[in-house]
Amino acid sequence: MKIVALGVNSKTGKCCIIKSNATYDMLKENYDLYKVEYDSINWCGRDDVERTLELENIKLTDNSFNHKETVRGTDYDHGHDYPWTFKFDIVYEVEDKNNY
């Protein structure tokens, strides 16, 4: 799974772009995440899908957070909930989120 998150450093006020599979110690600073975009294979294993999660200032105070989403398959009339654990790495910070 490929994940990119947008957020803001709650200490410095700078916006940041975060990517997955990181070893950065997130306990050193707190980040408020407000958007996550990721690519994954859907639950029936056929299609690569892109999903965007709109977050409301999730406090990232450790190395991950859990999100449960409902995935709907075209061949089924019901959804399935899957818990994801996202792990992030700070790539860089910018002054203005409009620079994304």
What spans do the regions from the language model cover?
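Mature extracytoplasmic domains of secretory-pathway proteins
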Residues: 30-32, 36
